[in-house]
């Protein structure tokens, strides 16, 4: 499985490198340290002929701002809805060389072992950033805990918000909080 992810990333990187093959300078790619920078560094290791400089992102650094300013040539960390949201926020348009894997998202609870034990009016913490909030809502829908407006069909291409919930049979309370706070909130939510 890990090899498949590296292979997929290699294909995606090859696509993005195709247009830069004539450039003399290294291709500078911004990436989160794990797993994206690890994948890029693995690719560099298996193909040393690639002139690739991996720029690892630190907390608070926006890779799209780096791309817009020319500090990097490409970035590798986001899915299409996040990219579209960033284009609006930055007033820029970026080219997509290839789409790649999306990090998994899960549902966790310290209080309940399965979805059927989730009580009426349970509080569910979700990330408050646009794209991960949408992914969380699609995940809740996949477990039949809510239903989104039918116009939201694909989490890879559309962004849903709590306003787009059309059915909520358990009357879940959706609590939007900062992503790093979610693990700390598990004792306070359902």
What are these model-derived regions, one by one?
Residues 18-24:
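Sec/Tat signal peptide C-region and signal peptidase I cleavage site
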Residues 1-5:
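N-terminal secretory signal peptides that target proteins for export/translocation
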Residues 92-101, 173-175:
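Short beta-strand->loop
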Residues 97-147:
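A conserved helix-loop-strand patch within extracytoplasmic ligand-binding domains
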Residues 51-59, 149-158, 171-178:
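Short beta-strand-to-loop elements that line the ligand-binding cleft
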Residues 30-53, 62, 66:
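Short, polar/charged alpha-helical segment
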Residues 46, 61-75, 88, 137-139, ...:
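Short helices/loops that flank or line small-molecule/ion binding pockets
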């Amino acid at each position: 499985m890990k090899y498949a992810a590296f292979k997929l990333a290699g294909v995606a990187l090859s696509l993005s490198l195709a247009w830069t093959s004539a450039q003399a300078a290294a291709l500078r790619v911004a990436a989160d340290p794990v797993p994206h920078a690890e994948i890029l560094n693995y690719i560099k290791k298996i193909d040393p002929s690639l002139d690739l400089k991996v720029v690892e992102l630190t907390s608070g650094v926006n890779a799209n701002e780096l791309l817009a300013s020319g500090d990097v040539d490409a970035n590798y960390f986001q899915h299409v809805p996040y990219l579209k949201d960033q284009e609006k926020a930055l007033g820029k348009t970026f080219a997509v060389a290839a789409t790649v894997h999306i990090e998994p998202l899960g549902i966790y609870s310290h209080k309940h072992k399965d979805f059927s034990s989730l009580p009426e009016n349970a509080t569910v913490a979700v990330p408050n950033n646009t794209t991960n909030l949408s992914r969380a809502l699609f995940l809740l829908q996949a477990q039949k805990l809510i239903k989104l407006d039918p116009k939201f069909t694909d989490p890879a291409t559309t962004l849903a918000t709590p306003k787009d919930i059309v059915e909520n049979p358990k009357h879940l309370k959706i609590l939007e909080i900062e992503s790093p706070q979610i693990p700390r909130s598990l004792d306070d939510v359902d």
